[in-house]
UniProtKB/Swiss-Prot annotation:
Gene3D superfamilies: 1.10.287.70, EF-hand, Voltage-gated potassium channels. Chain C. Phosphorylated on tyrosine residues. Residues 1633-1648 have a biased composition (Low complexity). Keywords: Cell membrane, Coiled coil, Disulfide bond, Glycoprotein, Ion channel, Ion transport, Membrane, Phosphoprotein, Repeat, Sodium, Sodium channel, Sodium transport, Transmembrane, Transmembrane helix, Transport, Voltage-gated channel. Residues 58-65, 130-137, 200-269, 290-294, 404-416, 469-472, 531-543, 564-578, 907-915, 973-980, 1040-1104, 1125-1129, 1228-1236, 1294-1296, 1358-1378, 1399-1420 are extracellular. InterPro entries: Ion_trans_dom, NALCN, Volt_channel_dom_sf. This is Sodium leak channel NALCN. One of its GO terms (cellular component) is monoatomic ion channel complex. Disruption phenotype: Deficient mice exhibit abnormal breathing at birth and die within 24 hours.
Length: 1738
């Protein structure tokens, strides 16, 4: 028993358990606790417990008294069950003792706490029933934890087949990421909170009537509507006559009555900033600020707040969730299941003709039971004709249902034509289902999920046609038939399947969202059900609607404000935190999960990505081969090539028909040959450039001499061509690498990643080179054969991949060549080809002049002639901007901008046709555009030329804008009636800003990114329209005519709705004043009207679709919900909630997901595998990485060194960061001159400023002024500190409002330095900054589009009368106000109400037949198209592009320790080592220092010279080869390390992979050559050493004998002659040595290893001999013998040594050495040219 228990514990250890429901004991007495049915019963009881607590509210018991006893009974039963379970588990596990005791298990503790809460709830209910405790008392809050028992119901699904440590790491890492982004959000909330406090302060000044007295402020004292004002006369809004501007707080109103939103102090300010960042109600705050303070301050604050907080910072949450989900997806692939396995392996597949006539592979079950129908019926049932007939009938049914409309109150509703049509269609589809069941058999029919759905519709619609059920919830079944139409389009069907996947992910997420809503609703219900005057949480349905409203963000501020006012001032902060946390989780994390799931479903599999990469490359090659259709038209005409014509020729001679292009080749031949020679012979070109006036004969003679001298062999020429091709590839690769790079990481491993990748490459190349000669030997074992076979397979796969890549490259080159050949053939055979307007000649001087003017552009970039890299100049960014477009385009951009500025001054009251000053810009624009278009047409042609003006949509738009401007300028209509052609022309004229899209290349790229994903966006639109059509048809059938009601709430029947009544006026939404006894709200008398709601109705499908489209944008759905519940019934509220949930959670997130996927596809990252995407992120990180701007520590241990240690200590840095935060807290209240609190706060700020001066002084002393100035962060600190010192001086000198404002600005600037001191904040701020930089052109595109709509809005709605939302602040009277309104609409703030205000028609307005500026009516069709198109383009597409950019950039900084290629720690280590080598902090080091840098690296970048000596040589030689022995930068070395640290086969794309492999192969060959040379040199040195040693032994013996003899013989005459000859020889040897050494230095390897350097050092000082010195003398023997005899007789040290060596025969080693030397000499003469050229050229 014990062994079995241990084994079960061990097996369960690596798997994450799902709680204490597992069987942990085999005790027979408590065996029931381990039964599966007990587990299921307890899970059901958990759901029952949640239902019970949802019913347990005072209001519910008041409406349904028996529920009090029902809940008491249920809770009692649940209490007994869970208590018994708890006792049994305590008995099994033990309470405290043991490893698995009850207290030590977290799930058991949770279950025990739930049992305790159940007991508390039960005891409390007993007291409530006995009337001991009041039901409305706060004691009911003890039930708040009870809904958490819902976790027990779903705990079983938390069981993962993964190691617990891995799941813990994933959750920990995800939590860290979410926590980091939350800190980032808090930083911006605090920043804008401080800014709000100092810029605005309180909004307590209102316009009140003149006789208002303190303590007597009522609703009738305020202006209607309530208006804020400014006490200063120069700024803000001034009250009208009869009113005065007063502070309501001074008049006696409390904080609760004034409302909680504002910028009074830092807490309220952060609360208000968060409300505004949710884009709900922010615009009304801005209007209040505009009325109370200077206008520019409000616009700056709120627009930047929306841009940074709402659009950038909050979208980082989406990026975090997407990245985290992508990582979890890889780990949980087993749990979700694979998306590709749609059919089981047991089923077979066959081709089937689909409805569109195409073929599809469909699964066919061989064993499917067939029905009893005849074969002809079965064949008919499977035919495409039958399929299309049924779908066409579904289409007709949908059209008929959509045609239904409200026909009036007196019309008979039961048996109209729509009902009869529905009966007919129901019978038809019933017959279809019966036929399929007859043909397939019931089992075969029901096995298909599609047939199950059809059967459900058949049953539901059959019940629906029953008269009593016709207008009921069964209508859903009828309208759901439209879903069957998805089968018509295979693309739509595939898209739907791709998005929703197997349904498990999205379904589980929907269940999770619903469960979260239920739990949070139950918690809020028990928290607020006892609060008086709050009806939002009295019952569970109301609580659910309120929490769902917060989830959708529509009106969530109203829910929170009502709750805050009801709970009182004391509990308001806690309640606000509760709602904000729930809103934060629901809107950011939960919605981001939906986006992540949809993006995951749109993701392709890894193998499909590589296949699609190849297919896409092939498709690109095919498309490049074809000419555009406008040029292929010339192929339809007969060929008429131009022939040679000679102007002066006698008539006796006839010119043969020779093509002019053929003769031109010979005419230009001499010039081409000369250019070719100049390319080959650099000396020739230089000499000719030096003497340009040299005669032609001398030139030819000089060239001829050069040609004769330089004789090129065939091999050298081929070698040159090969090197040139390789050089081009390497230059391209170098250029690409110099512009890219970056790094992130993994934990340190035992083995360096450089070493691992090097061994992978070596193994791969050994396979590639050795597999051709692989033969199976007889003695090999089976394992060896298997290994060899796998190696062969791997080699073949690699070889096949290589061949595919090369084939695609060749295909691309051939396509480009083919296209050029086609163009040349057309140019030669058709005289009118490439002739602008068929008039201007191809090479005409005027056309060449136009080309020069059109294509002239600024170009200040300098290119390195060796590497081809672009050298960065000092102002290269400015130069790049100037060279972005041509000079002509710059002129037109300037003219267009000036014209748009002029258009901004137009209004309905200052029109261009009546204002001569506005006409100047109009004339200038048309004149300049005429000149531009004429130049471009004469240079490039209009349409039928290769580079025509009209070759894409941009050219068409240019011509269209020009024609519209020209027609308007010529016409200039004086009277423009509304909805006329002249007004349409004025609207089209507003498209002028779109010209900038065409003129700027990056703007054209934005447009391509928008329209390239049009197909997917179109499919999403179809899905959403289908959803809207389903619900619109349902709404028409259920709510048509039912939403109309009398505007007097006291009248119920239509007959009584007549006469007049008094209606109250809404004065203010912010103030919470209570009516005093006898007081009435302001109002007036109006007639009673029986009418639909103003903004929506369901009387026909068109109006219903419009209402649902507004609801789909999550605007106005709360009003639709309230009207439906109030006028039709509470049960029908489910309708709008289901639609909003589907539209919000799935519909809108679909747009986000599709736009992000399309953006990735356009960027080229959609088809990248995981490794390739990480490699791209790595290169992008490398761009951002910079050397550390930190000077080295002073050498000695003096005062500066101690200062350096102090300033670099972490404790010092944290202290400074805390001081910065402490100084920022001083801005918690507004610094006002009149406030006595300001003086001590400013004094404390002065103290902080002196502390920061001390900090800067210490750093300057420690680092020296030059070292301090290296860091940008130090420069910023110095700037802020200097400003602080200036402020201190001004503060004590002046002490006025301006000095206080300056002091607050200095503190805010100091607050920004927090980001640099915190790693996570710095990383996330970098994400936002880079996103802003990359999205600059998208933002400019949004603004240009906004400008076009603003100009059109001024023309269409400039004089519309004020309504509910068109008012003093929001209107289209000028372009500036129109831009403000449109920016408000971008955020979705009541855009539908503004649209309805602009739709106002007579009799509610005054029309005018002659001029549009004299009427105050709107334009119904214009408003519909205007607002809907603007909202879809901007809010659904353009804003989601911002999200896509943020997601892309966040992935650069998203660090996971396991999966990244290089971590931040590795990069930090490299920066520190670089600073050690780059001691001068220049950012570059000489090439020879690279080897020292590489030897100093440790960790994952370490190169072990004992194991990876060859890798070390390759890396050093790569640096020397790419940079020609010059200086290398920080990014050069980091880029080389990045290439060496990845598996290039997996990470690099096709072109880059080829270039990189070619470079590495070349480096290997060169290093191999150098290694051979080094080895031969060492061998020769060793041979020399042996020969010298043998000669020295004999010489020493001879010398000793000669010394003894020399004592007796001293012939002076002979001694003086012989050594002189020898000395000459020695002197010759020495004179030859420098040449030899220089030659060896030239040919020595460019990198030397340690062994070679030691050998050279050991040989230093030894005699060096020439190569020919070891050859035997050729003189006759007698002479040598005579000489030797003389020498022996007379002696001499040098001579004796030479003679001995010559007389002894050479040993075998010496003869071998001479042969090696001869071979070595030949190799040097041949290979020195090749290798030397390689090194120098590249």
């Amino acid at each position: 028993m014990l062994k079995r228990k241990q084994s079960s514990r061990v097996e369960a250890q690596p798997v994450t358990d799902f709680g204490p429901d597992e069987s942990l004991s085999d005790n027979a007495d408590i065996l029931w606790i381990n039964k599966p049915w007990v587990h299921s019963l307890l899970r059901i009881c958990a759901i029952i417990s949640v239902i019970s607590v949802c019913m347990n509210t005072p209001m519910t018991f008041e409406h349904y008294p028996p529920l009090q006893y029902v809940t008491f009974t249920l809770d009692t039963l649940l209490m007994f069950l869970y208590t018994a379970e708890m006792i049994a588990k305590m008995h099994i596990r033990g309470i405290v003792k043991g490893d698995s005791s009850y207290v030590k298990d977290r799930w058991c503790v949770f279950d025990g706490f739930m049992v305790f809460c159940l007991w508390v709830s039960l005891v409390l209910q007993v007291f409530e029933i006995a009337d001991i405790v009041d039901q409305m008392s706060p004691w009911g809050m003890l039930r708040i934890p009870r809904p958490l028992i819902m976790i027990r119901a779903f705990r079983i699904y938390f069981r993962f087949e993964l190691p617990r440590t891995r799941i813990t790491n994933i959750l920990k890492r995800s939590g860290e990421q979410i926590w980091s982004v939350s800190i980032f959000l808090l930083f911006f909330l605090l920043l804008y909170g401080i800014l709000g406090v100092q810029m605005f302060g309180t909004f307590t000044y209102h316009c009140v009537v003149n006789d208002t007295k303190p303590g007597n402020v009522t609703w009738n004292s305020l202006a209607i509507p309530d208006t804020h004002c400014s006490p200063e006369l120069e700024e803000g809004y001034q009250c009208p006559p009869g009113f005065k501007c007063m502070d309501l707080e001074d008049l006696g109103l409390s904080r609760q009555e004034l409302g909680y939103s504002g910028f009074n102090e830092i807490g309220t300010s952060i609360f208000t900033v968060y409300e505004a960042s949710s884009q709900e109600g922010w615009v009304f705050l801005m209007y209040r600020a505009i009325d109370s303070f200077p206008r520019w301050r409000s616009y700056f604050y709120f627009i930047t707040l929306i841009f940074f907080l709402a659009w950038l910072v909050k979208n980082v949450f989406i990026a975090v969730i997407i990245e985290t989900f992508a990582e979890i997806r890889v780990q949980f692939q087993q749990m979700w299941g694979t998306r590709s396995s749609t059919t089981s392996t047991a089923t077979t597949q066959m081709f089937h003709e689909d409805a569109a006539g195409g073929w599809q592979l469909v699964a066919v079950d061989v064993n499917k039971p067939q029905g009893r129908a005849p074969a002809c019926l079965q064949k008919m049932m499977r035919s495409s004709v039958f399929h299309m007939f049924i779908l066409s009938m579904v289409t007709v049914d949908v059209i008929v249902a959509a045609s239904n409309y409200y026909k009036g109150e007196n019309f008979r509703r039961q048996y109209d034509e729509f009902y009869l049509a529905e009966v007919a269609f129901t019978v038809l589809f019933d017959l279809e289902a019966l036929l399929k069941i007859w043909c397939l058999g019931f089992t075969g029919y029901i096995s298909s999920s599609l047939h199950k759905f059809e059967l459900l519709l058949v049953i539901g619609t059959t019940l629906h046609v029953y008269p009593d059920l016709y207008h009921s919830q069964f209508t859903y079944f009828q309208v759901l038939r439209v879903v069957r139409l998805i089968k018509i389009s295979p693309a739509l069907e595939d898209f739907v399947y791709k998005i929703f996947g197997p349904g498990k992910k999205l379904g589980s997420l929907v269940v999770f969202t619903a469960s979260l809503l239920i739990v949070m609703s139950a918690i809020s219900l028990q928290m607020f059900c006892f609060v008086e005057e709050l009806d939002r949480f009295t019952t569970f349905p109301r609580a659910f609607m309120s929490m769902f409203q917060i989830l959708t963000q529509e009106g969530w501020v109203d829910v929170m404000d009502q709750t805050l006012n009801a709970v009182g001032h004391m509990w308001a902060p806690l309640v606000a935190i509760y709602f904000i946390l729930y809103h934060l989780f629901a809107t950011l994390i939960l919605l981001s999960l939906f986006v992540a799931v949809i993006l995951d479903n749109l993701e392709l599999d890894e193998d499909l990505k590589k296949l699609k990469q190849l297919k896409q490359s092939e498709a690109n090659a095919d498309t490049k081969e074809k000419l555009p259709l406008r040029l292929r038209i010339f192929e339809k005409f007969p060929n008429r090539p131009q022939m040679v014509k000679i102007s002066k020729l006698p008539s006796d001679f006839t010119v043969p028909k020779i093509r002019e292009s053929f003769m031109k080749q010979f005419i230009d031949r001499q010039q081409q040959d000369t250019c070719c020679l100049f390319r080959i012979l650099p000396s020739t070109s230089s000499s000719s450039c030096d003497n340009p006036k040299k005669p032609t004969a001398e030139d030819n003679k000089y060239i001829d001499q050069k040609l004769r001298k330089s004789v090129f062999s065939i091999r050298a020429r081929n070698l040159l061509e090969k090197e040139t091709a390789v050089t081009k590839i390497l230059r391209a690769c170098t250029r690409q690498r110099m512009l890219s790079g970056s790094f992130e990481g993994q934990p340190a491993k035992e083995r360096s990643i450089l070493s691992v990748q090097h061994h992978i490459r070596q193994e791969r190349r050994s396979l590639r080179h050795g597999s051709n000669s692989q033969r199976i030997s007889r003695g090999k074992s089976l394992e060896t054969l298997t290994q060899d076979h796998s190696n062969t397979v791997r080699y073949r796969n690699a070889q096949r991949e290589d061949s595919e890549i090369k084939m695609i490259q060749e295909k691309k080159e051939q396509a480009e060549m083919k296209r050029k050949v086609q163009e040349e053939e057309l140019r030669e055979n058709h005289p009118y080809f490439d002739k602008p307007l068929f008039i201007v000649g191809r090479e005409h001087r005027f056309r060449n002049f136009c080309r020069v003017v059109v294509r002239a552009r600024f170009n200040a970039s300098k290119t390195d002639p060796v590497t081809g890299a672009v050298k960065n100049t000092k102002y290269h960014q400015l130069y790049d901007l100037l060279g972005l477009v041509t000079y002509l385009d710059w002129v037109m951009i300037t003219v267009t901008i000036c014209s748009c500025i002029s258009m901004m001054f137009e209004s309905p009251f200052r029109r261009v046709m009546h204002a001569p000053t506005l006409q100047i810009a109009e004339y200038v624009f048309v004149i300049f555009m005429s000149i531009e278009l004429n130049l471009k047409i004469m240079a490039d042609g209009l349409f039928f030329t290769p580079t025509a003006v009209i070759r894409d949509f941009g050219g068409v738009m240019d011509i269209f804008i020009y024609l519209v401007s020209l027609i308007f300028l010529c016409w200039m209509p004086q009277n423009v009636p509304a909805e006329s052609g002249a007004q349409l022309l004025m609207v089209l004229r507003c498209l002028r800003p779109l010209r900038i899209f065409k003129l700027v290349p990056q703007m054209r790229k934005v447009v391509r990114e928008l329209f390239s994903g049009f197909k997917e966006i179109f499919l999403v639109s179809i899905l959403l329209l289908t959803l809207m059509l389903v619900f619109a048809s349902f709404g028409v059938q259920l709510f048509a005519g039912k939403l109309a009601k009398c505007n007097d709430p006291n009248i119920i029947r239509r007959e009584d709705c007549n006469g007049i009544f008094r209606i109250n006026v809404s004065v203010s939404k912010n103030l919470n004043l209570k009516l005093r006894p006898g007081e009435k709200k302001p109002g007036f008398w109006v007639p009673r009207v029986w009418a639909n709601p103003r903004n929506f109705n369901f009387d026909n499908v068109g109006n219903a679709m419009l209402a649902l489209f507004e609801v789909l944008s999550l605007k106005g759905w709360v009003e639709v919900r309230d009207v439906i519940i109030h006028r039709v019934g509470p049960i029908h509220g489910i309708y709008i909630h289901v639609f909003v949930f589907l539209g919000c959670m799935i519909g809108l997130t679909l747009f986000v997901g599709v736009v992000i996927a399309n953006f990735n596809e356009n960027k080229g990252t959609a088809l990248l595998t995981v490794d390739q995407r990480r490699w791209e992120d790595l290169k992008s990180r490398l761009k951002i990485a910079q050397p550390l701007h930190l000077p080295p520590r002073p050498d000695n241990d003096g005062f500066r060194a101690k200062m350096y240690d102090i300033t670099q200590h972490p404790f010092f840095k944290r202290t400074i960061a805390l001081l910065v935060l402490a100084q920022s807290v001083l801005l918690s209240v507004k610094w006002d001159v009149d406030d006595p609190v300001t003086v001590p706060l400013a004094t404390m700020s002065v103290v902080f400023t002196f502390i920061f001066v001390l900090e800067v002084t210490m750093k300057i002393i420690a680092m020296s002024p030059a070292g301090f100035w290296q860091s940008r962060r130090n420069r910023y600190d110095l700037l802020v500190t200097s400003l602080g010192v200036v402020w201190v001086v001004l503060h004590f000198a002046l002490l006025n409002a301006y000095t206080y404002m300056m002091g607050a600005c200095v503190i805010v600037f100091r607050f920004f330095s927090i980001c640099g001191k915190h790693v996570t904040l710095k990383m996330l701020l970098l994400t936002v900054v880079v996103s802003m930089y990359k999205s600059f052109f998208i933002i400019v595109g949004m603004f240009l589009l906004l400008l076009c709509y603003a100009f059109a809005g001024v023309v269409l709605f400039g004089t519309v009368k004020y309504g509910e939302n068109i008012n003093r602040h929001a209107n289209f009277s000028s372009a500036g106000k129109a831009i403000t309104v449109l920016f408000r609409i971008v955020t979705g703030e009541d855009w539908n109400k503004i649209m309805h205000d602009c739709m106002v028609q007579p009799p509610f307005c005054t029309p005018d037949e002659f001029t549009y500026w004299a009427t105050d009516c709107g334009n119904y069709a214009g408003a519909l198209m205007y607002f809907c198109s603007f909202y879809v383009i901007i809010a659904y597409i353009m804003l989601n592009l911002l999200v896509a950019i943020i997601v892309e950039n966040f992935s650069l900084f998203y660090s996971t320790e396991e999966d990244q290629l290089l971590s931040y720690n590795d990069l930090r280590h490299f920066q520190i080592i670089w600073n050690m080598v780059d001691d001068k902090r220049e950012g570059v080091i000489p090439t020879f220092r690279v080897k020292f840098l590489l030897r100093l690296l440790r960790g994952r970048l370490e190169v072990d010279l004992d194991k990876d000596k060859l890798l070390f040589k390759h890396m050093c030689y790569e640096m020397e080869r790419l940079h020609n022995g010059g200086d290398v930068t920080f990014h050069d070395v980091l880029s080389m390390l990045s290439y060496r640290s990845v598996d290039i086969r997996k990470s690099l794309q096709l072109e880059e992979l080829l270039a990189r492999e070619q470079l590495e192969y070349t480096i290997e060959e060169e290093v191999a050559k150098q290694t051979i040379r080094m080895w031969l040199k060492k061998c020769l040195k060793r041979i020399r050493a042996k020969q010298q040693q043998s000669c020295s032994i004999i010489h020493s013996l001879r010398e000793s004998q000669e010394q003894e003899r020399s004592r007796f013989l001293n012939p002076p005459s002979i001694e003086t002659t012989q050594p002189s000859e020898d000395s000459n020889a020695n002197s010759q040897d020495h004179s030859m040595q420098p040449e030899t050494s220089s030659q060896q230095q030239l040919l020595s390897p460019t990198l030397s290893d340690r062994g070679g350097s030691r050998q050279d050092a050991a040989d230093t000082g030894k005699p060096q001999r020439k190569i020919g010195q070891w050859r035997l003398p050729s003189a006759p023997k007698p002479i040598s013998h005579s000489v030797s005899s003389v020498n022996l007789r007379f002696g001499g040290r040098t001579t004796m040594k030479t003679v001995v060596c010559k007389m002894n025969p050479m040993p075998d080693t010496a003869s071998c050495g001479s042969e090696v030397k001869k071979w070595w000499t030949r190799q040097l003469t041949v290979e020195s040219d090749e290798s030397g050229d390689d090194l120098l050229d590249i």
